[in-house]
Amino acid sequence: GRAPAPPAEPVALRASASYLVTGGLGTLGLAWTRWLVRRGARHVVLAGRHPPGAKAREALAALASAGARVRVVQADVASPAEVTALWRRLDDGPPVAGVLHVAGLTEDAALGATAWDSFARVLAPKLAGAANLAAAAAAREHPLDFFVGFSSIAALLGNRGQAGYAAANAALDAQIAELRARGVPAWSIAWGPFAANTRPEVLTAAQRRGIAALEVDAALAVFERLLAGPPGHAVVMAVDRARGEPPAGVANPALFAGWTGWSAAPPPAGAERDASAGAADLLAQLAGATPDQRLALLTDAVNATTRGVLALDPAFALAPEQRLDELGLDSLLAIDLVQALGVALGTTLPTTLVMDHPSVAAIARYLANELT
């Protein structure tokens, strides 16, 4: 929903307490660590699976010069044993007053091509990580002032190639709700894509749905408002309201009904009819064609559809045998291509089509064999 009104007073943190940030060495973890220090925190522990890189070390030096004691602990929060060891380290300092659970992992792939091991790896930091951290905190004498889980709009809108990530964040949202039911001041914030740490192709896919990139400073301002209010679940994303409709993929447009100028817009009149007619025309041409003509028609159709998905310059020569991943067709765009070809041909195609047949010519040959 919309951001709450700004708090009368900015959030003040305690210099006599410690604050834990998981995923603390990443772009967002460091941004929120700087916020903690600006708001008065003087003891911060950053947990991550890997040692700090050059940029993180530079950020840590700046935080130290600001008067904060920032410790880095290498730990996988999905491991109960490592979280237990982490909390023993925390017990050496002031009591922990707040947890920012930023840690997460993505392994994008079409669901049909996703192995369970990959799915489980993506679930682990969000689901097991939150459970392990909450259990460790509950075993301590001092209650938390806040526990904030960094979730994603993937749990609300879905995202092509991110079934595991969507499930992980939905599970995190549910787990945070359970913590609130047990009396823990816990927030779950489903963030939209950030400009600072999101791959360009993912931002492009989001923009096609009417979702803009979040800037960290704007997100921090909203975060502070949320933390000054009652614990709960919030969705924070930058949306292109000029579209005049909710973001594409929203299962319940009524969620956005209070936003002026938005409504549950139906598809353009005749859009489905036009798509069906186009598919029927192509299928009719294929039905009366010789094998060589069928292959040529399908090659042209795949070529045109690929150009549209990749937004290629009309002057660019797309070689039939060139691998599409060499042109920037990642797993998300590959799913777009499969769906677009399915519409063009009036059929459902396997989600692994591009993985199995990675060029225009290979896809056309596959279709020529399948559509006989």
Regions found by a protein language model. Name each.
Residues 1-247, 261-372:
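4′-phosphopantetheine-dependent carrier domains
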Residues 44, 253-256:
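Short loop/beta submotifs within extracellular cysteine-rich repeat domains
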